[in-house]
Amino acid sequence: MPKLRSATSTEGRNMAGARALWRATGVKDNDFGKPIIAIANSFTQFVPGHVHLKDMGSLVASAIEEAGGIAKEFNTIAVDDGIAMGHGGMLYSLPSRELIADSVEYMVNAHCADALVCISNCDKITPGMLMAALRLNIPVVFVSGGPMEAGKTKLSDKLIKLDLVDAMVAGADSNVSDEDSAKIERSACPTCGSCSGMFTANSMNCLTEALGLSLPGNGSMLATHADRRELFLEAGRRVMVLAKRYYHQDDESALPRNIANFKAFENAMTLDIAMGGSSNTVLHLLAAAQEADVDFTMADIDRMSRLVPHLCKVAPSTPKYHMEDVHRAGGVMGILGELDRAGLLHTDVFHVAADEGGNLKSVLAKYDVMQTQDEKVKHFFMAGPAGIPTTKAFSQDCRWPSLDNDRQEGCIRSREFAFSQEGGLAVLSGNVAENGCIVKTAGVDESNLTFVGSARVYESQDDAVAGILGGEVVAGDVVVIRYEGPKGGPGMQEMLYPTSYLKSRGLGKACALITDGRFSGGTSGLSIGHVSPEAAAGGTIALIENGDRIEIDIPKRSIKLAISDAELNARREAMLARGPMAWKPIGRERYVSLALKAYAMLATSADKGAVRDRSKLED
């Protein structure tokens, strides 16, 4: 029987000092011997997805203590990618993922916690906590802050739904009046919560459901809705169930590495492809798999992308649906149910929502709205928006008049009526990206599935933005932004501003963009990121020159620089001849702090999840 980890600091006379300190935090005589459950919160007033999380730790703690545990809360940092975007702040976003993972590990191991509840929400916080949870391998439950309500406003007497991307595009579009731009800006992000489309934050919170580490509704229940309160309470109760199963019954199925195994990672990626999730999820799943010692690679993602249909289309891929609409259609469990009926899901995997002895199949039987007989579950998925601006959680209790069970023309489709039989993400490879790159096909217009154009090369995102807004980029160009990978940036910046500005100049369907950086979950269009190897690691993207012909063929999963092998080799030799300046951007001026330099020294390319190069840390 496993011994409580916390016994290390609570048992024996030699731990009298540690017990004295525990007592100073409120622990009583009869508490010693109970499991200590760490609550990793990520409250901050900088981020709308986290601004309402201040009291959530106390809510989870109340359920833990009622179930017989000791709850101790700590906080992590949280970077808002939207606020950090478009300037040097974005260099810190991806590196913050590793910092969050390390900080959770530090706190949990330093204090010998027995189990963990992760309160996350936005872009790098959920992945960072996920990496930590799989690294620690103690019982864990994830519960997120929930999505923001979609914005709504009237333009030309027509009511439209909005999100963050609409504000960015309108702000850069000279054809939009100052009045309309301001109106969109004020309406785009009306409430607390993670941005309202299928962007990175919501994608990752959905994937924790598919991995088996969070409760049904975690990815789709609105941050403002009163029903979300129960998710926090149940997370506290459920982590105690898992802790007792492991420490009292020696049941290792309660551990995250046995829940999030290879099959679960396949389920998560299947969901991601089916719902057209953010391309960043590929990066984060690859990183999490390494922490879990699961051999899940780009090759698996490529294989699955050819098999899984696109069953759920959400903003930014369409203005019609946002996360509140996904929830009304049954949320993640609704999509997983359709994937199961299509024979594309492993249902024999463990899940934190399953009763002892149960698995994902039993969870779907209860929570898939197309098969459940539970009226409470149906009521749960009818939770809707109030349309009232607020920063407060649980502030409203509005309901849709009915569920969206239309699997032919609704938000979630059956395989027969899929938005497309090709999934929402694809892995491309070729001499531009020998180790692969990612495109969110859900956001690509059918006319652009094949594209041939001339390279317009930029050594940084800043130069690309200036070039796009300055009229350098014209229809038919392939914008190449390099030296923005994990090592070369450093930090692998998101390229939402370049893609948004292409749209604002009417070039969204007339140009392609490729980069060793990454894209916001809000990106759509022919935007190809995660090019691996990156330029700073000797990738071919560093050898592309202005005017080169680049051929993109998504159906054939290829991306090619159309020059001879002899010419490519000559360019490589010329690059190597630059000596210490080889594989570095020419003429770029950028301040890189010591913290970012330390990150860059260990960073791998995107095909490895941009995690640390462990070979550099081995004895």
Curated annotation (Swiss-Prot):
PROSITE patterns: ILVD_EDD_1, ILVD_EDD_2. Its cofactor is [2Fe-2S] cluster; Mg(2+). GO terms for cellular component: cytosol. Keywords: 2Fe-2S, Amino-acid biosynthesis, Branched-chain amino acid biosynthesis, Iron, Iron-sulfur, Lyase, Magnesium, Metal-binding. GO terms for molecular function: 2 iron, 2 sulfur cluster binding; dihydroxy-acid dehydratase activity; magnesium ion binding. It catalyses: (2R)-2,3-dihydroxy-3-methylbutanoate = 3-methyl-2-oxobutanoate + H2O; (2R,3R)-2,3-dihydroxy-3-methylpentanoate = (S)-3-methyl-2-oxopentanoate + H2O. Mg(2+) binds at D81, D123, K124, E494. Its EC number is 4.2.1.9. Gene3D superfamilies: IlvD/EDD C-terminal domain-like. Pfam families: ILV_EDD_C, ILVD_EDD_N. GO terms for biological process: isoleucine biosynthetic process; L-valine biosynthetic process. InterPro entries: Dihydro-acid_dehy_C (IPR042096), DihydroxyA_deHydtase (IPR004404), DiOHA_6PGluconate_deHydtase_CS (IPR020558), ILV_EDD_C (IPR056740), ILV_EDD_N (IPR000581), IlvD/EDD_N (IPR037237). [2Fe-2S] cluster binds at C122, C195. The modification N6-carboxylysine is found at K124. The keyword Metal-binding applies. The active site is at S520. Pathway: Amino-acid biosynthesis; L-isoleucine biosynthesis; L-isoleucine from 2-oxobutanoate: step 3/4; Amino-acid biosynthesis; L-valine biosynthesis; L-valine from pyruvate: step 3/4. Belongs to the IlvD/Edd family. HAMAP family: IlvD. This is Dihydroxy-acid dehydratase. It comes from Shewanella putrefaciens (strain CN-32 / ATCC BAA-453).
